Amino acid sequence: MLLRMALCLTVSTILCAGFASNLMDILRRPVNQVWDMFEESHLPAGIGLDAWSKAKEMATAMTSLGASQRALFLRQVSPSQADLTEAALVLRGAQPLPEDRKQVFIREGSPSTAVRDLAEALYSKGAVLADGTGRGALKMMSAFQPGEAFMLTIKLSLYAGVVISFPLLLYFLLQFIIPGLLEHERKLLYKCMAVGFGLFLAGTLFCYFIVLPRVLTFFYTYSLEFGISNEWRIGYYLSFATQMILMFGLAFELPVVVMPFVKLGVLTYDMMKSTRRYAIVAIAVLAAVITPTPDVATMMLMAVPMYALYEICIILAWMHERKEAARTREEIARFEEDFNNNNSPYNQ
């Protein structure tokens, strides 16, 4: 069993290592979203992030050009993009001035009314003036040891291999008890494995697309409030993100843990319904431990889906008991019918 699990994990890790660069891009996506959301929140309505990023890049290129060359340069783009580029130039020119003189420079130094209005709107929103999209502010690729990048690739491939080979690993793990199960118990186990992988995948995707960007945004803005630059090391971020994603995947396994006990009669609908308040407390504590941020909103992103899954378990337990009760009534009715028709062995 252990040998099969080791071989399965080794093969999946080697396969994932061939796509390490793609996996790294996928894992970096939430970080890029953090900066995009931060920069978009500092732009006036009607100005897109791509247009503003292009305007800043063009403004940087124009600093080394003469007046005639600048005019020729701006004629190569649309009038709206040209106005936005000149607004970026005005804002950068005002940047080293005292706060009480910046607005004066913006108002009097703008070449046209349209540029002045754009510059004032951008200034009032606190638009980010760094070149490009500003994602370089998050130094994600810093490595401080010669073999750190290689070890990160191995670690990332291992985490991805665990996710991909999860059904097989679970199957090999359960092979120890499968021979001792009855036929209906085996069928139940296989169903639980299929549902478990689906829930595990749903939990990881939920964390990746919804929870992780929110958590990173919280840490990013929290650091800025204290004047701390966000220079996140790739190794720390990789461990943080992968562990959080895997924890969410495991947390979504709640129905797989509960329903077998319901099927075996250990847990009942009445028992789960009467202990709902204790389940809520346990889920809240677990969510507070797993989520790394202290804010309630992020904790609720973990607690609400888990509680919804618990309620689904209660409904499934109720449906299971109704089904079993109907089956029992049907068997009793069949027995009574056989008894009345003298087909029962007790009448012979």
Curated annotation (Swiss-Prot):
Cleaved signal peptide residues: none
Q: Which residues cross the membrane?
A: 7-27, 162-182, 192-212, 244-264, 278-298, 299-319
Locations listed in the record: Cell membrane
Keywords assigned by UniProt, alphabetized: Cell membrane, Membrane, Protein transport, Translocation, Transmembrane, Transmembrane helix, Transport
Single Gene Ontology BP term?
A: intracellular protein transmembrane transport
Would the keyword Zinc be found if you checked this record's keyword annotation? Answer: no
Magnesium as a keyword? no
Q: Which terms does the record give in the GO molecular function aspect?
A: proton motive force dependent protein transmembrane transporter activity
Show the Pfam families listed in the entry: TatC
InterPro entries of this UniProt entry? Answer: TatC
Q: Name one GO cellular component term.
A: TAT protein transport complex
Function description: Part of the twin-arginine translocation (Tat) system that transports large folded proteins containing a characteristic twin-arginine motif in their signal peptide across membranes.
Q: How does it assemble?
A: Forms a complex with TatA.
Family the UniProt entry places it in: Belongs to the TatC family.
Q: What protein am I looking at?
A: Sec-independent protein translocase protein TatC
